[in-house]
């Protein structure tokens, strides 16, 4: 709207859809990014930029299946002529480049003579990444335990009123109310909006009893666990920790590191400090049983032990490990063992665990980075139990 020389206002009309073109393009791009994230989850969960982000809200991750569009110079200046067989359709290939193939981009130890593969580095919200990952995960075999006397208070927006805080205006219901009132006067429109049209979302305080769970995160930090093995184990525990704290109200996590001896450590030390020495896995199982006896009564807690190692255990200790694992399973909902074994070498610990015959025992062997995602799905797969998670809060 503009003013002419005579002082009157003129109303001009234009195609406002053109103003949305940039927004629509952005929306389409974001949708492609989300689809690429979902399709590349097995590779993205072990990206170093995420694991080392310390929980930052936004991280940059490479998405190799998504092209970043740009103009590229055509180095092949030859002209090509193609001829079909007479019944070709749009999109059919009628000719191919006859130029000799070059060596290509360098891979492995050899040097290549071509440019490398470009990939798109996207800024992704850690919350969006977690949403894509956690929607398939759930604590398995979750059971109803003896309730604590403690209850927690939650807020639920479950009512609509005519008065309330400005920040809680329900825009959709307000506009519908205005439209209905204006329609009754013969002028159906969203404008004007009067005070009596305003609708406000309001909340109620809801108290819910707590049923608790504890996860025992056990990691081998001995000398046989190299940089890659520790990175794989910590990647798993990084996502496990974020998953538990995102989806569950009350869950305790105990971090236990071990070599020949086991000790409870802080979360920061668990994810940062390295140690050396030999490997006696029974030490970490004894420490877990001590924690259960001292702090976590099985009658009141759902107990989930997770142990990650490279499987290189003292051979004479394997029989003790099997006995202690069976003792732990009598008090826990599940026992999960993850073995980082990149080269498929002989594992003394895994050979002993093959004799464990209990439905509560689950294991996964990780040979490559994408196996972290598969291990999460395997260990946190929802299984039928006496009481489902949806029936009560944890």
From Swiss-Prot:
Pfam family, one: DUF444
Signal peptide range: none
InterPro entries registered for this protein in UniProt: Spore_YhbH, UPF0229
PANTHER family attached to this UniProt entry: UPF0229 PROTEIN YEAH
Family: Belongs to the UPF0229 family.
HAMAP family: UPF0229 (MF_01232)
Protein name: UPF0229 protein RBAM_009260
Species in which this protein is naturally found: Bacillus velezensis (strain DSM 23117 / BGSC 10A6 / LMG 26770 / FZB42) (Bacillus amyloliquefaciens subsp. plantarum)
């Amino acid at each position: 709207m503009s003013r002419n020389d005579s002082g009157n206002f003129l109303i001009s009309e234009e195609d406002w859809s053109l103003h949305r073109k940039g927004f629509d393009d952005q929306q389409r791009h974001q949708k492609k990014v989300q689809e690429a994230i979902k399709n590349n989850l097995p590779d993205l969960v072990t990206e170093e930029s995420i694991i080392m982000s310390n929980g930052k809200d936004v991280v940059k991750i490479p998405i190799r299946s998504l092209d970043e569009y740009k103009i590229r110079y055509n180095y092949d200046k030859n002209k090509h002529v193609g001829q079909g067989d007479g019944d070709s359709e749009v999109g059919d290939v009628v000719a191919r480049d006859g130029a000799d193939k070059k060596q290509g981009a360098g891979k492995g130890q050899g040097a290549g003579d071509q440019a490398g593969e470009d990939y798109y580095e996207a800024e992704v919200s850690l919350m969006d990444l977690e949403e894509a990952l956690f929607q398939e995960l759930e604590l398995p075999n979750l059971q109803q335990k003896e309730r604590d006397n403690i209850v927690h208070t939650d807020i639920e927006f479950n009512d609509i009123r005519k008065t309330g805080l400005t920040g809680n205006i329900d825009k959709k219901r307000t506009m519908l109310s205005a439209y209905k009132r204006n329609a009754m006067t013969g002028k159906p429109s969203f404008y004007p909006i009067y005070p009596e049209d305003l609708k406000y979302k309001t909340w109620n305080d809801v108290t819910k009893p707590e049923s608790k769970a504890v996860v025992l995160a056990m990691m081998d930090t001995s000398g046989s666990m190299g940089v890659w093995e520790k990175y794989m184990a910590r990647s798993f525990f990084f996502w496990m920790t974020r998953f538990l704290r995102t989806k569950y109200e009350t869950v305790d996590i105990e971090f236990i590191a071990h070599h020949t001896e086991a000790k409870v450590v802080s979360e920061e030390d668990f994810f940062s400090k390295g140690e050396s020495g030999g490997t006696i896995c029974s030490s970490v199982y004894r420490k877990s049983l001590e924690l259960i006896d001292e702090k976590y009564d099985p009658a009141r807690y759902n107990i989930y032990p997770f142990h990650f190692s490279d499987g290189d255990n003292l051979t004479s200790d394997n029989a003790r490990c099997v006995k202690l694992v069976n003792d732990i399973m009598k008090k826990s909902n599940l026992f999960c063992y993850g073995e980082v074994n990149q080269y498929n070498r002989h594992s003394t610990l895994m050979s002993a665990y093959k004799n464990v015959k209990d439905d509560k025992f689950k294991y996964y062997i990780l040979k490559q980075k994408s196996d972290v995602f598969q291990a999460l799905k395997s260990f946190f797969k929802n299984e039928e139990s006496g009481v489902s998670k949806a029936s009560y809060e944890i």
